[in-house]
Regions:
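Hydrophobic alpha-helical transmembrane segments
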Residues: 5-16, 107-122, 202-207
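Transmembrane alpha-helical segments and their cytosolic interface motifs
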Residues: 63-89, 116, 120, 133, ...
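Hydrophobic alpha-helical membrane-embedded segments
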Residues: 11-39, 75-89, 120-142, 189-190
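Cytosolic/matrix-facing juxtamembrane and C-terminal tails of multi-pass cellular membrane proteins
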Residues: 149-157, 163-172, 219-249
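Alpha-helical transmembrane segments of helical membrane proteins, especially in multi-pass transport
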Residues: 129-198
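Juxtamembrane "helix exit" motif at the C-terminal ends of alpha-helical transmembrane segments
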Residues: 1-3, 82-109, 197-206, 212-217
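Cytosolic juxtamembrane amphipathic/interface segments immediately preceding
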Residues: 2-3, 54-70, 168-176
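Membrane-interface amphipathic/juxtamembrane segments adjacent to transmembrane helices
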Residues: 29-67
């Protein structure tokens, strides 16, 4: 690689491939690209089933515990993304040491320092994106907790079924939307792992992106987890004809 500040054609092609794969995976996971149900859309149907079951319970401590678990998991990933982002700042300060290590690898020549720093900035952008997605998801789960509290008790809902249905719909849509942003943040973390291949070279970047894409597709469409969730009710869930499918992010 030359001493230019600009990325090579191979670098740009690998980066474009990476972004295209990210976009395709996101659309496929949300049920907007292929007819086969993904694990994400199947779980969205289960979120709706959860809200309907919750509305039938007089005591909702189990639902509160589930929400706490979702919030804690989201907070963990948000904190981890922030720590990784701080590590990238340290990486920028140790650029010479990292380039020395890369120069010893037989796979590719070490890039110029300026190009290396551009790649680190790209990694920081990925982690910042993931952090903001996790942060917003955490807040949406908070909102969902409030909406769950606003769902009438079963006896009251029986007297006003329309109000009960509207409250269930609000809680479901908020829960699905919170899950969507959490999945987007998780996708950013996963793809940041594939992004690491770019520090070796554009060929390695394309290879790690392809391998990551294959793993994520298998989990979404061909995994045991998907088979455990899929049933007739899920076939009508969000992303496959259900009215509970928020389009805005």
């Amino acid at each position: 690689m030359g001493d230019s500040l600009f990325l090579t054609g191979a670098d740009l092609a690998a980066l474009a491939f990476f972004l295209a794969v990210w976009l395709v995976h996101g659309l496929a996971a949300d049920g907007k690209l292929v007819g086969r149900m993904s694990l994400t859309t199947a779980m969205n149907a289960q979120r709706e089933a959860w809200m309907r079951t919750m509305a039938q319970r007089e005591l909702r401590m189990i639902d509160t515990s589930i929400m706490v678990g979702l919030q804690q998991g989201t907070a963990f990933f948000a904190s981890s993304s922030l720590l990784a982002l701080g590590g990238c700042f340290a990486l920028l300060g140790a650029s010479n040491d990292v380039l020395s290590v890369l120069s010893d690898l037989p796979l590719a020549d070490a890039p110029p320092r300026q190009v290396f720093e551009i790649k680190v900035l790209g990694l920081m952008a990925l982690l910042a994106y993931a952090f903001f997605k996790f942060g917003w998801s955490y807040r949406l789960f908070n909102y969902c907790s409030i909406l769950i509290g606003a769902v009438p008790m079963h006896k009251e809902g029986s007297a006003a079924p329309a109000a009960m249905e509207a409250a269930i719909g609000r809680a479901t849509r908020m829960n699905v939307l919170a899950g969507r942003h959490f999945n987007a943040g998780l996708r950013g973390v996963f793809f940041s792992l594939g992004y690491l291949g770019w520090f070796v070279g554009p060929e390695a970047f394309a290879l790690t992106t392809t391998l990551l894409f294959a793993v994520l597709l298998r989990r979404q469409f061909f995994s045991a987890a998907r088979l455990a969730v899929i049933d007739e009710s899920a076939q009508a869930g969000p992303g496959n004809g259900s009215s509970i499918r928020p389009d805005s992010q």
